[in-house]
Every structure is written in structure tokens, then in C-alpha cells.
Amino acid sequence: MSFSVTLPDGSKKEFDKAVSVKEVASSIATSLGKAAVGAKVNGQVKPLDYEIDSDVEIAIITDKDEEGLDILRATAAFAFEAVAKKKYPELRLGQHVADEGGFYVDTDKKDQIKVTELPELEKAMEKLIKSGQPIEHVVMDKSELEEMFKDDPFKSDLLKKIDSDKVDAYKLGDFVDFGFDALLPNTGKIKHFKLLSVAGAYWLGKSSNPMLQRIFGTAFFKEAALKEDLKRRAEIKERDHRTIGRDLDLFFVDPKVGAGLPYWMPKGATIRRVVERYIIDREVADGYKHVYTPVLMNLDAYKTSGHWAHYRDDMFPPMDMGDGEMLELRPMNCPSHIQIYKHHIRSYRDLPLRVAELGMMHRYEKSGALSGLQRVREMTLNDGHTFVELDQVQSEFAKILKLIMDVYRDFDITDYYFRLSYRDPKNTDKYFANDEMWERSQKMLKGAMDDLGLDYVEAEGEAAFYGPKLDIQTKTALGNDETMSTIQLDFMLPERFGLTYVGKDGEEHRPVMVHRGIVGTMERFIAYLTEIYKGAFPTWLAPVQAEIIPVNNEAHGEYAEKVRQELAKRGFRVEVDDRNEKMGYKIRESQTQKVPYTLVLGDEEMKNGSVNVRRYGTDEEISKSLDDFINEIDADVKSYSREN
């Protein structure tokens, strides 16, 4: 027997008998043999003891590789399973996942594991790690595993998904589990780890399945990396809009009433209203006609648009109204704006026709994907569509992009890049079938960006089903890539809906439709702002811009109300805290609620017609006249908006 192993640099090593991954690594270099934690064999991750006896391509994995971290974290998950099963014999284990985010294990137990129990489980894992117990890789008959897990519905479910008679499994003493690509050869290799949190998760992500408990953790080869990761996670937790939304009473979601359906509390509604008014004013100033259109539409419109064929899985089921009428909750606003266009006969003099709306939409998101305001089932999109002549496309594109950049400047959004999103040429079935249209529109989009001299990346497979688009990708406060804005060229929908305009030649022509979103949905945008600002919104956005605290309600309450009225009539959002609480407590509460200005009013202030001002985040108190404070807060508001 003779075979060759091809290395990443193209070189080959010849062997005349079966060898393990570790032996291949050692044959390359003794140091590599010691550093190896696994390998990619023909693209698949394999453990160190995996045997090779034929021609293969191989890339050795060490602790320097991302796959090495995955192997480490999978081993940590396996070790957690072993100690958890020993501590709670009645515990049933579900699926386990290890990736760039760490690892998690789904568990089922009558009395759920409390987060306060995690340190005890960590100690058990540390003891197991110090013992350096061997982890044995075995290939077992599927039937043997089925018998072993016959009373475990979760493992039985997972085994049903395996179509091979042989299954890779791992043993640690009497404990056995399967579903791992590769694990380290003993527990002593796990090094630095942390159990992080617990959460609920439906089995296999389906809301019709039982709710299990998901235990999250992470692991690293180096202690410094673990410490840095934990620091990053603390920052993420501090910025999480769901936590801030709860603490500042901005919004809530009650799964019992409806998962993915947020309720906006007064403060959250105020922030949203300020953003919406800002957006509408900017768009109207830019020539857009703002409209309102119904959230329900005849299903035939979505069959014509192609949404029903290409987007059905993300739409709610249609409502049968009888007599053949089928109504659909709209997942997108474009067919509605097309009806606005079609309502009148259009001439070239009407173009560009810019239609905009804060349009409410509904999309069927799986319950497991829902998250705060970022992933919801009901959303309001800052949507707009421009109908143009062909020779107006590039100038309109530039105009829309300028509007987006102006908005970004006002909200201080600086961390972004441009992505041209094309269809996937290898999977054209999910797109509108017109090669000429795709080539033409992709070329026009690219040309518009090149004419503006802007850098961009190109991404195949990220286009909408009806046309290519420019996506503006922002970096969230939590470090995630997110599409904030889009500009999209569409030759398809005007054709499908028979849109026309009368040209200068008196003949009918087909307009081009430009879809655009400036800040996406209100829900996602406000989640983004909440995390960027950590809930400390700039004064122009803050739900309460000034909090007035009278030292004594009886003595100073009337003056406090006078100051409130004076500020309110100038358009500032101001409240009086006249609760029967200690003044120090009320001041701390104002700071906790991240109110930009706290005004304390006592005898001195009432006598002089002044206010004692404390800015959020400082301990400094400054006494000034009410007029001076009004000038200060007015300048502050204008410094964050286009008014200055």
C-alpha cells in the first residue's frame, strides 16, 4: 500500500502504511506534531487519531487556527456534558455547538440549572481538567447508539438525522456522546474556560418543540485571550439594547401576548417619534412625497410582484375573506407605492417621482431568531421608491447617497462601508429570471459607484430577488456587521405591474424603479442607537431632556412647575420629580435614567429665578439664571441636529 498526502503548499508526503493525523503532523516537523490539535482532511475537520490510508489533501490545525479554537470549545462542551450528567443523573442532553462565539449545550431537567450553580459546575470541570483524563474517539454502530439512547427523545432525534450506519462518538469514562467533528485527546488540554449564562431555547429552534435550557460557555488556549473575551462580553452586556430598554423603560416584548411584537413605552415612543419626524422632514426637504398605505393587500399583488414565489416563507399566511378574496399582511411596501404611481397617468415631467413612507410591515420570523428590537415580526420601515427615466438613474443614485450621508452625519454614524450586492450566478433560481436585466442593472450600479469615486466590496448572493443593490454596512456597538441603508435598481417590478410614462416623444416608456431605505426599520435603528449611546442619548434625542427636582414639594413645587412650563413652551421635553422621596435618591435616579440635565430647585433658586444644573455623567453643579440655562440647552439640542 502506498499513498500520498498533499499539504497546503502543494508538496506531498508519501506513506506506505496507514498513519494518523498526529503522525502526519510529526512527520512534517516534531514541533508541529506537538502543536497539532486536529486537521482538515479533504476539507473536513478530523481528530488527531483519525487514520489516513489513501490519497488526501491535509491541513494541520493548531491553536493558532480558528478551527483549533472550535476543537477546544467542542472539548470544553463535552467536558461540561460529562460533569453535568454526573452531577444531575436525570439530566438529558440535546445538541451542542462550538463556534467563534464560544459553545453551548442544550439541556433538559425538571428543576432547571440556575445561573448560581454554574460556579459549582466550573469547579467540577476544573477538577476533571486537572485529572487529564483521556477522551477516547470511537466509531460505533448507529444501532448501538440508538439502543443506548432509546429513552432519550433528544438524542434519538439527532440519531435519526444521521444516514450512516457508523457514527463517530467520544468516551470519557462511562460517559458517551456523539455529534462532534473532533475533540482534544484528553481533558488536560482544555486550559482556560468559563461558563457564561443560561437561557431558554426551543428544541431544534422550533416553537412547537419543548423548551430546553441552553448553557453557554467559552474556552481559549491562552488566559489573556479569555480575559479579553470576558471584558468584551461585559461591554456587550452593558450596551445590549434589550437590557437598556428594560432599565430605561423604553420598550418590552411579552411572548405571552406575541413574540416579536414590541410595545413602545412613553420614553421609547418619544425617541421613535423624534427620529420619525426628523426622517420625514429630511425626505420632504429632498423632494419626497410622504404617503400612508394599507398594511393589508390582495394576495394577487404579491403574486404579480414575485414575493409570493420567492419570499413566501417569510410572509404570514394569507387571510381568506370569502368570495375568493385573499388578503395578505405586507412584508414589503414596494407594491403599495407602485399603486400610488399607477393612480395617475404619468408624464416625463413627473419624473423623478419620489414616494416615501414610514410603512408598517409584517414578516414571519421564526421564534428562535427573534431578538429585542433587532429581529421582530412587526416593523416600520423608513422606505422610499423613486420612479425615474433611464438617463436619470445615476443622478438619482447620487442624490439618494448624499441624503444617506447627511443622515449619517447628523447621527454621528462613522463606522461603515459600501457593499454592492449581486445575484448568485451559480444559483439563479431564487432570482427574477432575466439575465439581460441583471447584467444591465449590476453594471449601472457599479458605474454609479465608480463615477462617485467610492470604494466598495462586491458580494455575490446578497441581492434581493428582483435586483442588485448597494448595501451600506455599519458596525454595531456590539461589533456585528449590519445593513443600515440600501439603494436598489429595479427593472422587474415596473415591467410586471405594467408601469408606464409618456415621454417627450409622446410614446409610452417604462420607468426604472429605485428602492431605498435610509435607516432601515425604526425598530432596528433605535436598537442600534441605544447600543451606540449606551442609553445616554444626545439631548436632541433624549426622551426627557431635563428633570426638575424641587428640594421641598410644598415650598418649591410652584416654582418647579413654572420652570417646567417655561421650558416646555420652548419645545423642550421636561418632567418634574415631585415624588415623596429623598432628594439624593431622586438625583441618583435622574442620573440612572441618563437624563441630560438635572435641575435642583431650592430657596436660593426660587429667590433668584435661577436653576442649579447638573449634567449627566458629572458631579459638578452650576447655578445659572433660567434664561442662561435655556440658551445652553437650546444650543446643545441644535449642536446635534441640522439646525446649527
UniProtKB/Swiss-Prot annotation:
Listed under GO biological process in this entry are: threonyl-tRNA aminoacylation
Mind listing the UniProt keywords for this protein, alphabetically?
A: Aminoacyl-tRNA synthetase, ATP-binding, Cytoplasm, Ligase, Metal-binding, Nucleotide-binding, Protein biosynthesis, RNA-binding, tRNA-binding, Zinc
**What is its EC class?**
ligase
Which InterPro entries does this chain map to? aa-tRNA-synt_IIb, aa-tRNA-synth_II, aa-tRNA-synth_II/BPL/LPL, Anticodon-bd, Anticodon-bd_dom_sf, Beta-grasp_dom_sf, TGS, TGS-like
Q: What is its EC number?
A: 6.1.1.3
Magnesium keyword on record: no
Ranges for domain TGS: 1-62
Paired cysteines (S-S): none
Localisation: Cytoplasm
Segments of this protein annotated with the region Catalytic: 240-538
Signal sequence residues: none
The yes or no answer to whether the keyword tRNA-binding is present is yes
Q: Which reaction does it catalyse?
A: tRNA(Thr) + L-threonine + ATP = L-threonyl-tRNA(Thr) + AMP + diphosphate + H(+)
Per the record, GO CC terms? cytoplasm
Q: Which residues bind Zn(2+)?
A: 334, 385, 515
Query: Example GO molecular function term?
Result: metal ion binding
Cofactor details (free text): Binds 1 zinc ion per subunit.
Cofactors demanded by this protein: Zn(2+)
Protein role: Catalyzes the attachment of threonine to tRNA(Thr) in a two-step reaction: L-threonine is first activated by ATP to form Thr-AMP and then transferred to the acceptor end of tRNA(Thr). Also edits incorrectly charged L-seryl-tRNA(Thr).
Give the family, as the similarity comment puts it. Answer: Belongs to the class-II aminoacyl-tRNA synthetase family.
Oligomeric state and interaction partners are given as: Homodimer.
Which protein are we looking at?
A: Threonine--tRNA ligase
Species in which this protein is naturally found: Lactobacillus acidophilus (strain ATCC 700396 / NCK56 / N2 / NCFM)
Gene behind this protein: thrS
